[in-house]
């Protein structure tokens, strides 16, 4: 048994920004009290990981990225009660401690124990469980899934159905839940409403699915890559528009298409100009615009405050507004009951050592979700 021992395994280490991943042998320490060591089976490639490589999301280096995954518990530290060795689990980049003001509120989901920003990039006790070539390696978002084994705090891991296919449900660890929940939980899209979704990547398509599940009558997909339109329509978009096809600003195009603007708009890209456009494209008085894409570090947004004065609501959504430890097992159960699909989001499945190819597919717009298998 490996319990209580250091495990040597393969991991994708990012030694510095704007460089490819390096597959290295790392040492993964055993879990301390209230920690869980997990063998990762499948992990998705998400734009947020690429944001660290590009410098949009500022993190310390060297680091093991990855936050959308599924695996099996290898061993647990002292005092862990919610999971046991052999359990199938999904790591949670938004933990749920159950004790902080946010966890105790019925409204929020961004547990105070999160390590998204500003990030320590370490375990909650301020230390790392990874070493490589004698150097401590940083964690990412309390998850670090681009490795055969990782260590998570018990508050950052959810036990799921033992029959769940891990190479599919790993998307519930980030991309799918983030988009689907932005529509259902954050915006609370109503039946018969009109929606616009800016950005039709994996998360944007999940927003489309959430709008459809909520009963929206019109769902307009907005993307500069028209190759994304067929899949968007397959998943529920009623119209798709490419801003490049128009000389006028996209919010004016959407206003003309809908009369007074959409009831709900979603920015799922992470660009300040599209955030402002999404706000301007929703109904002047009761429109709701939701920021889902990760905003770039150190950028400011300028917009006409009259857009809000007239009554619009502007809000953000992290992990789809779901309280993670409570909701992830339920979302997996819903998937098992075929209440939604994940297959159309997974365009590529690659062996783990091809991680750099997977990121190239993301950057060139050739993939929606690539899943890496160990």
UniProtKB/Swiss-Prot annotation:
Report the cofactors: Zn(2+)
BP-aspect Gene Ontology terms? retinoic acid metabolic process; retinol metabolic process
Q: How is the cofactor bound?
A: Binds 2 Zn(2+) ions per subunit.
Gene Ontology CC annotations of this record? cytosol
Query: Does DNA repair count among this protein's keywords?
Result: no
InterPro entries referenced in this protein's UniProt entry, alphabetically: ADH-like_C, ADH-like_N, ADH_Zn_CS, GroES-like_sf, NAD(P)-bd_dom_sf, PKS_ER
Its primary localisation, in coarse terms, equals cytoplasm
In the record, the note on similarity to other proteins reads: Belongs to the zinc-containing alcohol dehydrogenase family. Class-I subfamily.
Official protein name in the record:
Alcohol dehydrogenase 1
Phylogenetic classification of the source organism: Eukaryota, Metazoa, Chordata, Craniata, Vertebrata
């Amino acid at each position: 048994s490996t319990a209580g021992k250091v495990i040597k395994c393969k991991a994708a280490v990012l030694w510095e920004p704007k460089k490819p991943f390096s597959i290295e042998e790392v040492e993964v320490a055993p879990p301390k009290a209230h920690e869980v060591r997990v063998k990762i089976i499948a992990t998705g490639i998400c734009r947020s990981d690429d944001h660290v490589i590009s410098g949009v999301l500022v993190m310390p280096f060297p680091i093991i990225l990855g936050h959308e995954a599924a695996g099996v518990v290898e061993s647990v530290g002292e005092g862990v009660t919610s999971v046991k060795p052999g359990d199938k689990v999904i790591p949670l980049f938004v933990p749920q401690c159950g004790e902080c003001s946010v966890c105790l509120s019925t409204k929020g989901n961004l547990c105070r124990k999160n390590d998204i920003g500003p990030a320590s990039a370490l375990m909650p006790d301020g230390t790392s469980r990874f070493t490589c070539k004698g150097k401590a390696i940083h964690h990412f978002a309390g998850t670090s899934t681009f490795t055969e084994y990782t260590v998570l705090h018990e508050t950052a891991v959810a036990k799921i159905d033992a029959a769940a296919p891990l190479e599919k449900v790993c998307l519930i660890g980030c991309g799918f839940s983030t988009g689907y929940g932005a529509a259902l939980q954050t915006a609370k899209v109503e039946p018969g409403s009109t929606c616009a979704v800016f950005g039709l990547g994996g998360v944007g398509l999940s927003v489309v699915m959430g709008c459809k599940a909520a009963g929206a009558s019109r769902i307009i997909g907005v993307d500069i890559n028209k190759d994304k339109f067929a899949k968007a329509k397959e998943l529920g978009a009623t119209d798709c528009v490419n801003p490049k096809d128009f000389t006028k600003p996209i919010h004016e195009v959407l206003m003309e298409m809908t009369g007074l603007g959409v009831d709900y708009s979603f920015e799922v890209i992470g660009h300040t100009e599209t955030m402002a456009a999404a706000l301007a494209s929703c109904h002047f008085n009761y429109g709701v615009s939701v920021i889902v894409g990760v905003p770039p570090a150190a950028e400011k947004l300028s917009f006409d405050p009259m857009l809000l004065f007239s009554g619009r609501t502007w809000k953000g959504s992290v992990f789809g507004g779901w309280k993670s430890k409570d909701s992830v097992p339920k979302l997996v159960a819903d998937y098992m009951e075929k209440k939604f699909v994940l297959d159309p989001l997974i365009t590529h499945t690659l062996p783990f050592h091809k991680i750099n190819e997977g990121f190239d597919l993301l950057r060139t717009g050739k993939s929606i979700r690539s899943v890496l298998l160990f």
